[in-house]
Curated annotation (Swiss-Prot):
This is Replication origin-binding protein. Residues 39-195 form the Helicase ATP-binding domain. One of its GO terms (molecular function) is DNA replication origin binding. SUPFAM superfamilies: P-loop containing nucleoside triphosphate hydrolases. The gene is U73. Keywords: ATP-binding, DNA replication, DNA-binding, Nucleotide-binding. It comes from Human herpesvirus 7 (strain JI) (HHV-7).
């Protein structure tokens, strides 16, 4: 069924927009509530699944239901966030439900309370079953299973399934419940009756609102910042949601400069967790990120309008999280939401495809059929992810929704369309550049083009704090260095002895014996970047695969050494981080598949490694590699790197024209040859997996040696090989000129090379798997001091 979804139904299916049209198992009854707020305490079915928009009274209905539960029955409430769990406890106490405990206030490792509120990641601490099981914001709970903070996926998955199968009543609520949630409970509890309650009632606080998508940030009649300044100039208060910390900092600095007299509150992860929103009433401008989400609501009539700055970036909050966060302000006097999407960081290659198409009323059948191929291809690749998710039934069951949420972040039209659907489902009128959604396709094309052409990058914020610029090399080369307990000191500069030990361990495990200690330190410093950590792990595993080490041995080494290896954040070793701290990729199987694919590509291209910058790559080799590996490359690009690309055999000139119009990009030609497509997907793989750029290059006359570095003797040898007379050529300059002219006359095919950091040149081929016991002894701090 999953592979037969029509293109325009994909988002509707996975975000619950078409529940009334679905057919369910015989034990499922469907109820529609359209004239009142949510209520379900009188329903007799053991499983109650509630789909209701924001502001429809889901939590109030839950409280009324809990009041009907016998005091002797045990109740477990599972939340998606710690702050949400705490807010639920407060709401319960205000409504005389005083016998609930909050998991974070229980010191014991194992929890056995009769009535408990717990965040899903701590579910493994629960030691008993419960009569009544509540899953509030169930889609957000499911989303946590894909988070890197979920360190005990297998245990939590097993515990949740056990709790479901042993409960006598279940309540699951969310604004985007889909048919797969209903099917999930039907499969888990086939002997229970289920009530699917679809509530479409929306309070006036939301239904009276209008959302305006702004095409530009500064210039134009509907410029995002222009409207924001106008509101503040009239003495109104505004609330601004920013999807990233970078965009929040940018807007905060901009507003402080333009409105120095306004009271501004900035809430991001830098300021810590947000536990309350009551103080917002004291500010003219409140700027917040997704740290303010479900469980926190501002109910005072204080702000005139809501502004939303969405900085599309891989790893950022998905559109559902954005939608939930922007709904935290329940009342605005002008009933207006202004939204700006900045796609500056996702201007991806031409071959990247949209997953779905927006609800434009004038698509042709031919255009729909083109994007239907994209939709089916997306589903097919998502299904292949089952190989990586064997430790969790929940991750397996809901994987397509997860990949939709992550992949849309890298595609402007998908993000725009999905957010429009979510707003529309909450009865918020959506306007795109003056037109009411759904709009004509030409309007959609024009709008995305304006967003792409007008987007801007952020300048990196400079800090006034100046760090000590001394390096480890300068410290140990200075004769005035002293030892003070566990520290080496030079003035105010300190290095803990454990820092040197960590360098030693790092080399012993991963690097060649002859790598200089100060080069090792440079490598370790770069690993503070998450991208560099990912590249380093990929380079490690590819080297091990190339050496022919047994796969199970590599997996064991990954789990025991790579995954657990810690690196110091600073010289004094006050903080550490994990080498394997990588967003998105949490499965060893994924990394191993990347490594095997990388090794195959390396062999096809005759490279020394996947970060080899010295070897020329012929276009013929790239074409052959793409022909052999295209299906696996495209699968890995989607599943591991959440970048959706179709198979090149399905492309034609009109397909590419349509895709790129949707993305707001303009092609000089309407065609993309197989050669160009092949280069494109190989380039994308190297960039995603190894942060290396595949670029066109002039052929190197001697492999590994640039033209400017050739000696006179080497040039003479090349001229002789090419049968070029050098009778009258005496000087080095004359010889170089003759070589250049001769090269132009020779018929040469296109040549490419990799640009970037050749990290593989430092990596040991076997790690510590087959190293001698004395490896790395030269890295001791004593040796450093003696040198």
């Amino acid at each position: 069924m999953e592979t037969q979804l029509q293109n325009d139904q994909l988002f509707l299916e996975w975000f619950g927009q078409n529940l009334l049209d679905c057919h369910f198992a015989q034990n499922v009854s469907v109820y529609l509530q359209d004239a009142s707020m949510v209520h379900f305490k009188t329903f007799s079915e053991q499983i109650k699944i509630i789909r209701a928009p924001m502001g429809s009274g889901k939590t109030s209905a839950l409280i009324e239901f809990l009041k009907t539960v016998s005091y002797i029955d045990s109740v477990l409430v599972i939340s998606c966030r710690k702050t949400f769990a705490a807010e639920l406890l407060n709401r319960f106490k205000k409504n005389d439900l005083n016998d609930f405990y909050l998991y974070s206030e229980i010191k014991e490792r194992q929890i056995n309370k009769n009535k408990l509120i717990i965040q899903v990641e701590s579910l493994h601490r629960v030691t008993r079953n419960y009569h009544v099981l509540i899953l509030d914001e169930i889609m957000s709970i499911i989303k946590q299973f894909y988070s890197k903070t979920m360190t005990k996926v297998k245990e939590v998955d097993a515990k949740l399934l056990t709790l479901i199968r042993n409960s006598t009543q279940i309540v699951a609520m969310d604004a985007t419940v889909n048919r797969y949630v209903v099917d999930f409970f039907s499969l888990c509890m086939p002997h229970f009756k289920s009530a699917l309650i679809i509530n479409t009632f929306v309070s006036a606080n939301f239904s009276n609102r209008s959302a305006y998508f702004c095409p530009t940030f500064i210039d134009g009649n509907l410029a995002f910042y222009g409207i924001l300044k106008q509101k503040l100039g009239l003495g109104k208060n505004i609330c601004l949601f920013c999807s990233t910390v970078t965009s929040a900092d940018f807007m905060s600095e901009l507003l402080k400069t333009d409105f120095p007299d306004k009271k501004i509150l900035l809430l991001t992860s830098k300021q810590g967790k947000c536990h309350s929103v009551e103080s917002w009433i004291n500010y003219n401008i409140v700027i917040y990120t997704s740290i303010v989400t479900v469980g926190l609501s501002f109910d005072f009539l204080h702000f005139s309008a809501m502004f939303v700055y969405i900085h599309l970036v891989k790893g950022g909050p998905d559109m559902v999280s954005v939608f939930q966060s922007m709904g935290r302000v329940r009342k605005v006097t002008d009933n207006e939401i202004f939204i700006y999407l900045n796609p500056a960081l996702i201007q991806v290659p031409l071959s990247v495809s949209p997953i779905s198409i927006p609800q434009c009323y004038d698509w042709t059948l031919f255009e729909k059929s083109i994007l239907q191929c994209s939709c089916m291809d997306f589903n097919k690749k998502c299904l292949s992810a089952q190989n990586y998710l064997s430790n969790s039934m929940i991750k397996q069951f809901f994987r397509i929704r997860h990949y939709i949420e992550k992949t849309t972040l890298l595609n402007l039209p998908d993000s725009l369309y999905l957010l429009c659907l979510l707003l529309d489902s909450n009865s918020i009128k959506v306007h795109i550049d003056g037109d009411v959604f759904p709009i004509a396709k030409e309007k959609f094309y024009a709008f995305t083009k304006m967003l792409v052409q007008g987007c801007h990058f952020f300048e990196k914020k400079k800090t006034d704090f100046v760090e000590n610029t001394m390096t480890l090399k300068e410290l140990f080369s200075n004769t005035n260095i002293t030892v003070n307990g566990e520290f080496y000191e030079l003035g105010n500069f300190q290095v803990h002895k454990d820092y040197i030990v960590n360098l030693n361990n790092f080399q012993n495990l991963f690097l060649k014996n002859d790598v200089d200690i100060f080069v090792i330190e440079e490598i370790m410093l770069t690993l503070k970047s998450e991208i560099r950590r990912f590249v380093f792990i990929n380079a490690l595993l590819q080297k091990y695969v190339a050496t022919g080490i047994d796969v199970e041995k590599i997996k064991a080494f990954f789990k025991s050494r790579i995954k657990t290896f810690t690196l110091p954040e600073n010289y004094i070793c006050s903080k550490f981080y994990l080498l394997s701290d990588i967003s998105g990729v949490h499965e060893c199987g994924m990394l191993m598949d990347v490594a095997f694919l990388a090794e195959s590509i390396r062999a096809d291209l005759n490279l020394q490694s996947c970060t080899d910058t010295q070897t020329d790559i012929s276009e013929d080799a790239i074409l052959l590699c793409a022909a052999r590996r295209s299906s696996e490359i495209l699968r890995i690009l989607q599943i591991v790197f959440t970048t959706h690309v179709q198979l090149f055999e399905k492309y034609n000139s009109y397909t590419l024209y349509l895709f790129n119009r949707l993305k707001g990009m303009q092609l000089n030609t309407w065609s993309l040859s197989i050669a160009k497509f092949s280069v494109s997907i190989i380039r994308m793989f190297f960039k995603c997996a190894f942060n290396m750029n595949l670029v066109k290059s002039k052929p190197r006359y001697i492999v590994g040696k640039p033209f400017r570095s050739l000696t006179k003797r080497e040039i003479e040898t090349l001229l002789d090989m090419w049968h070029v007379s050098r009778t009258n050529l005496k000087t080095y300059k004359e010889l170089r000129k003759a070589l250049t002219e001769a090269s132009k006359k020779r018929q040469r095919k296109k040549i490419y090379k990799l640009l970037g950091h050749n990290i593989s040149s430092y990596i040991s081929e076997t790690g510590c798997l087959f190293q001698h016991a004395d490896a790395g002894m030269c890295l001791s701090s004593g040796c450093l001091l003696r040198s």
